[in-house]
């Protein structure tokens, strides 16, 4: 399956650019949370209960959840995406699409009958429903009331609603994680907003019983001491979070201006990426790649390109120049 961020693949296709790559192919914050050197001590220790408890308390507080027992830490949300379908009996699963393709792949692999749908489905028709909110790649987000109603209906019939909130840190008030009770599992990514994807850290927020089942499936030491220490500190850094949301919003608007001037229509996105459409998008994809600008293309939607945010003025300048006719 195609994913952004694979610069070795980009180099194999385009060659190595003289000035290095400007990687705009992911939805990752280009200005990461600064890791204090003291936190690196976690490299020398096994994850102990105190570290894990501190991480879960920080996550529960950051996500508006009162009980840390409703939060499970994992080595990235991808691990949760892989494991969750195996915790439920095989049945009919609706995936709100188009979206992150690993959801459908994981549920199919676990033996579920996957149906890709374009709108929130009726709970009566499915045993599980999966949606990404805000969605990747177009940023759409069903209303919180609609999501809560569907979660209640799924819970009443013994089903589950999985809400992938990988980009929800951009607007904490829009998250449904605090509502995650029986029948609702919210997935929260750490690496995207905090700009530390290599740390491999993510969370599931749900009811305590389901949380215990997920934790048991993941086994002991699901995340490293390093990830626990850095995650706990970053999740508690409210001032950085507020400043970062402002910076990302400003730069997303700047990206809108650049893309519109280059003849794109903005399809949607979040403050970490923009999905844009142009008839000759594939031609421009090749042009940008030869200039060392790596963006995300979609073979099934050849008029679409997804752009992450440049992280420096040099990268903005290179993108602007590469966009010129």
Regions inferred by a protein language model and the residue ranges of each:
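PLP-dependent aminotransferase class I/II
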Residues: 184-260, 264-266
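Short, conserved charged micro-motifs
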Residues: 35, 122, 126, 280-287, ...
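N-terminal "arm"/small-domain region of PLP-dependent enzymes with the aminotransferase-like
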Residues: 1-51, 58
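Conserved PLP-anchoring active-site segment centered on the Schiff-base-forming lysine
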Residues: 86-108, 113-115, 119-120
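PLP-dependent enzyme catalytic core of the Aspartate aminotransferase-like
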Residues: 143-145, 290, 300-325
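Active-site phosphate-binding strand-loop segment of PLP-dependent enzymes
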Residues: 115-170
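Conserved PLP-binding catalytic core of the aspartate aminotransferase-like
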Residues: 249, 259-291, 309
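Short loop-beta-helix segment that forms the pyridoxal 5′-phosphate
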Residues: 60-83
């Amino acid at each position: 399956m195609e994913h952004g961020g694979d610069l070795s693949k980009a180099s194999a296709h385009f060659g190595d650019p003289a000035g290095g790559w400007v990687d705009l192919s992911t939805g990752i914050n280009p200005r990461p949370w600064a890791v204090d050197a003291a936190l690196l001590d976690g490299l020398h220790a096994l994850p102990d209960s105190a570290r894990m408890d501190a991480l879960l308390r920080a996550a529960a507080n950051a996500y508006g959840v009162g009980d840390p027992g409703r939060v499970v830490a994992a080595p990235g949300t991808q691990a949760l995406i892989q494991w969750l379908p195996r915790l439920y009996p095989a049945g009919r699963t609706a995936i709100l699409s188009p979206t992150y393709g690993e959801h459908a792949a994981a549920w199919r692999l676990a033996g579920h009958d996957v149906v890709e749908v374009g709108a929130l489905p009726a709970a009566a028709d499915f045993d599980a429903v999966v949606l990404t909110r805000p969605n990747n790649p177009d940023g759409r987000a069903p209303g919180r009331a609609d999501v809560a109603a569907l979660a209640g209906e799924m819970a009443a019939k013994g089903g589950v609603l999985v809400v992938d909130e990988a980009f929800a840190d951009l607007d904490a008030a829009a998250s449904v994680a605090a509502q995650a009770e029986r029948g609702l599992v919210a997935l929260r990514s750490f690496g995207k907003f905090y700009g530390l994807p290599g740390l491999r850290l993510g969370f599931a927020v749900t009811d305590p019983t389901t949380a215990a089942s997920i934790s048991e499936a993941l086994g002991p030491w699901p995340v490293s001491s390093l990830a626990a220490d850095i995650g706990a500190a970053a999740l508690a850094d409210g001032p950085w979070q507020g400043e970062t949301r402002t910076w990302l919003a400003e730069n997303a608007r700047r990206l809108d201006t650049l893309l519109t001037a280059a003849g794109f229509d903005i399809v949607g996105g979040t403050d970490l990426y923009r999905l844009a459409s142009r008839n000759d998008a594939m031609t421009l994809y090749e042009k940008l790649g030869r200039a060392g600008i790596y963006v995300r293309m979609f073979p099934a939607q050849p008029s679409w390109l997804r752009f992450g945010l440049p992280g420096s003025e040099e990268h903005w300048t290179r993108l602007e120049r590469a966009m010129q006719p």
